[in-house]
Swiss-Prot record:
Disruption phenotype: Pale green siliques. Pale-green seedlings in double mutants glk1/glk2. The gene is GLK2. It comes from Arabidopsis thaliana (Mouse-ear cress). Residues 144-203 bind DNA. This is Transcription activator GLK2. GO terms for biological process: chloroplast organization; negative regulation of flower development; negative regulation of leaf senescence; positive regulation of DNA-templated transcription; regulation of chlorophyll biosynthetic process.
């Protein structure tokens, strides 16, 4: 059974606290039509529409449905409360407009307050903490008050450098530089920024120059000076890989070095008689490198045929290759060549006294020279080297 709760009805005759309830306890669902049937239900549905009349049975009397009249006091209270709400809304609107106008005035004061960009930036940063209105002011101000970027041309930079050099790099300040330059388009902030970059770049260049100077000093310190603290020794130089050190040719008067039997150039040597006293003799030829060497010939094949740094005339073995008379314009130099007897005597001294150094100009024969000489003499059966 469906039960409908009583609904309160407000009656405004003499008091607003008087209520009347209508009792719907006698109403049941038995008189309602059945809407669940499927089929030809048009007649039943039209017949059942009249069930709404049953809801209002017994409500014809004046005591049940009296005239609804609203008290003037209640109506005044409702109308007064509505007017108050309208006034409150109007007040809020006016307050918001006043606040926006005040914010616009603050933005204008901040934008036109100081001529220096640094103070304006501080004001804007302080205003960021106040809320969204300061951000709007910042965006409007940046669009209106943003200054163009300064183009430091070579001429402008030259004036800046002259002003800095006049004041001193360490003592120069932006205000004094700006006064000396006397350029209307520049501000103190522009000059200060350019001065900081100039000092940083100059410091970097000085550091590089100092490093290069110290490196040169260290490099020259490793090179010893002959005769000063080094016992007259020559400084060591790194050799070129694969090439022997260059030795300047030495000319010892009009004498030739002593050639030893077995050297490849000895059989081909032919003495030359000088035509004058001032004639110079060419250096002995160096043995040609065999074709079997893949690259550069060995170092010992390119050595001169006589020791370097010593004269041919010496106290030891003075009878070998040393003239016994003075040279002059009337006595032209003679191509003195040692005889076979003197050569055999020198070789005999070397064999008998192996602990003594070889005489000047006497060198052991090379392997190639010995093999060439043996082949020239017809010796073909040569034992292998140990």
């Amino acid at each position: 059974m469906l039960t409908v709760s009583p609904a309160p009805v407000l009656i405004g005759n003499n008091s607003k606290d008087t209520y009347m309830a209508a009792d719907f306890a006698d109403f049941t669902t038995e008189d309602l039509p059945d809407f669940t049937t499927v089929g030809d239900f048009s007649d039943d549905l039209l017949d059942g529409i009249d069930y709404y009349d049953d809801l209002f049975i017994g409500f014809d009397g004046d005591d049940v449905l009296p005239d609804l009249e609203i008290d003037s006091e209640i109506l005044g209270e409702y109308s007064g409360s509505g007017r108050d709400e309208e006034q409150e809304m109007e007040g809020n609107t006016s307050t918001a407009s006043e606040t926006s106008e005040r914010d616009v005035g603050v933005c204008k004061q901040e934008g036109g307050g100081g001529g220096d960009g640094g103070f304006r930036d501080k004001t804007v940063r302080r205003g960021k903490r106040k809320g969204k209105k300061s951000k709007d002011c910042l965006s409007d101000e940046n669009d209106i008050k943003k200054k163009p970027k300064v183009d430091w041309t070579p001429e402008l930079h030259r004036k800046f450098v002259q002003a800095v050099e006049q004041l001193g790099v360490d003592k120069a300040v932006p205000s004094r530089i700006l006064e000396i330059m006397n350029v209307k388009s520049l501000t103190r902030h522009n000059v200060a920024s350019h001065l900081q970059k100039y000092r940083s770049h100059r410091k970097h260049l000085l550091a590089r120059e100092a490093e290069a100077a110290s490196w040169n000093l260290r490099r020259h310190a490793t090179v010893a000076v002959p005769g000063v603290g080094g016992g007259g020794k020559k400084p060591w130089t790194a050799p070129a890989l694969g090439y022997p050190p260059h030795v300047a040719p030495m000319h010892h008067g009009h004498f030739r070095p002593l050639h030893v039997w077995g050297h490849p150039t000895w059989p081909k040597h032919k003495p030359n008689t000088p035509a004058s006293a001032h004639r110079t003799y060419p250096m002995p030829a160096i043995a040609a490198a065999p074709a079997s060497w893949p690259g550069h010939p060995p170092y010992w094949h390119q050595q001169p045929l006589y020791p370097q740094g010593y004269g041919m005339a010496s106290s030891n073995h003075s009878s070998i290759g040393v003239p016994t008379r003075q040279l002059g314009p009337t006595n032209p130099p003679i191509d003195i060549h040692p005889s076979n007897e003197s050569i055999d005597a020198a070789i005999g001294d070397v064999i008998s006294k192996p602990w003594l150094p070889l005489p000047l100009g006497l060198k052991p024969p090379s392997v190639d020279g010995v093999m060439t000489e043996l082949q020239r003499q017809g010796v073909s059966n040569v034992p292998p080297l140990p």
